[in-house]
């Protein structure tokens, strides 16, 4: 979204089993106002899938793999950014979002497998989305919607080659 830099850090990705979910984490972030995703694993397939979508559907979104997550967090904070870790063990989203929303540079950590305990100490905010086990994709979507206060629905995706024409029935797209 305009003026804010939101980037996802995906940790714990297992290439042999998490490709679809990690791709959907990136695409959800892209659609809901994130600028890009750092992937703390090597998976060129995920990176290429995400970049292909960004190329066709427009907008500025990067995806980089082989990121060392501890270094990424350290560098992000050194550059003045804040870190929000999505977890079912944090402070409930409605109780902390007003504190997070003013952050102009935000790294959102989304785990796949069990997240190392040190993440809770590295994060500026440990954010629970319901405090119940569910999808990391749903957590990211709800978090970004609350963070952007619904403004992501009016987002523009410059450079798109295709766009959807809203319709009550059927699928309508337009080549640009």
From Swiss-Prot:
Its main location: cytoplasm. Pfam families: Trm56. One of its GO terms (molecular function) is tRNA (cytidine(56)-2'-O)-methyltransferase activity. It comes from the Archaea. It is found in: Cytoplasm. Its EC number is 2.1.1.206. InterPro entries: Alpha/beta_knot_MTases (IPR029028), tRNA_m1G_MTases_N (IPR029026), tRNA_mtfrase_aTrm56 (IPR002845). One of its GO terms (biological process) is tRNA nucleoside ribose methylation. S-adenosyl-L-methionine binds at residues 86, 111-115. It catalyses: cytidine(56) in tRNA + S-adenosyl-L-methionine = 2'-O-methylcytidine(56) in tRNA + S-adenosyl-L-homocysteine + H(+). Keywords: Cytoplasm, Methyltransferase, S-adenosyl-L-methionine, Transferase, tRNA processing. One of its GO terms (cellular component) is cytoplasm. Specifically catalyzes the AdoMet-dependent 2'-O-ribose methylation of cytidine at position 56 in tRNAs. Belongs to the aTrm56 family. NCBIfam families: PRK03958.1 (NF003048). Homodimer. This is tRNA (cytidine(56)-2'-O)-methyltransferase.
């Amino acid at each position: 979204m305009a003026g804010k830099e939101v980037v996802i850090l995906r940790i714990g990705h297992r290439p042999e089993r998490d490709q679809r979910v990690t791709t959907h984490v990136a695409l959800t972030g892209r659609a809901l106002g994130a600028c890009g995703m750092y992937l703390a694993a090597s998976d060129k397939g995920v990176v290429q899938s995400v970049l292909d979508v960004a190329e066709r559907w427009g907008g500025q979104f990067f995806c980089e793999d082989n990121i060392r997550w501890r270094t990424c967090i350290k560098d992000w904070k050194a550059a003045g950014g804040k870190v929000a870790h999505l977890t079912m063990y944090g402070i409930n989203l409605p109780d902390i979002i007003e504190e997070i929303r003013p952050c102009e540079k935000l790294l959102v950590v989304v785990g796949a497998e069990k997240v190392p305990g040190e993440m809770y100490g590295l994060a500026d905010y440990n954010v629970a989305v319901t405090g119940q086990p569910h999808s990391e994709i749903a957590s990211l979507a709800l978090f970004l919607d609350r963070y952007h206060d619904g403004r992501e629905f009016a987002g523009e995706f410059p450079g798109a080659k295709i766009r959807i024409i809203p319709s009550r029935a059927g699928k309508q797209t337009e080549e640009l």
